[in-house]
Amino acid sequence: MKKHRLIPVLLLKNGWLVQSKGFVNFQNLGNPTTAVKRLSEWAADELIYLDISDSDIYNIRRDDQGYPNRKTFLEIISDVSKYAFMPITVGGKIRKLEKINEFLKNGADKISINKITRIKPEFVSEAAKEFGSQCIIVSVDYKNTNGN
């Protein structure tokens, strides 16, 4: 019997959890820490957090629901990992081995890389050699050309 797995992909834009239609219009869904608590209760098998922000520094200008104002994606992942009872995959703007190391030290279990694989394909091998192939994931963006 095939086991079904629940693996939500959460998009973070400027420190907020968002929903997107074609990466054009974004609807704010709230605090990423609150979401991970809820998904832990729902027994998600894994979480994927993707940073789609324009900047590396966030200024959300308030403390939401008693959670401190996190200023970087790394701080958010560090905070979220305290409440996650499942593996966390992190992706977005990861172009250096040092950044992978920082995320792994701050609670990430796996790293998703995307754009750098087109610019520097050997980065996948370098990352797998340094951190192990079990924690490096390559994600691929695609677009249908026939309009569907």
Name these PLM-found stretches.
Residues 12-18, 104-148:
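Conserved anion-binding
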Residues 34-50:
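Catalytic domains of carbohydrate-active enzymes, especially glycoside hydrolases
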Residues 58-89, 125-142:
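Alpha-helix-loop-beta-strand connector modules within alpha/beta enzyme cores
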Residues 4-10, 19, 47-49, 88-92, ...:
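Hydrophobic faces of well-ordered beta-strands that scaffold small-molecule active sites
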Residues 12-35, 87-94, 143-148:
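Active-site mouth loops of central-metabolism enzymes
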Residues 21-27, 54-57, 62-67, 148:
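Short glycine-enriched, charge-decorated loop/helix-capping segments at active-site entrances
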Residues 38-42, 80, 103, 127:
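Generic structural signal for hydrophobic
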Residues 75, 79-111:
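Catalytic cores of alpha/beta
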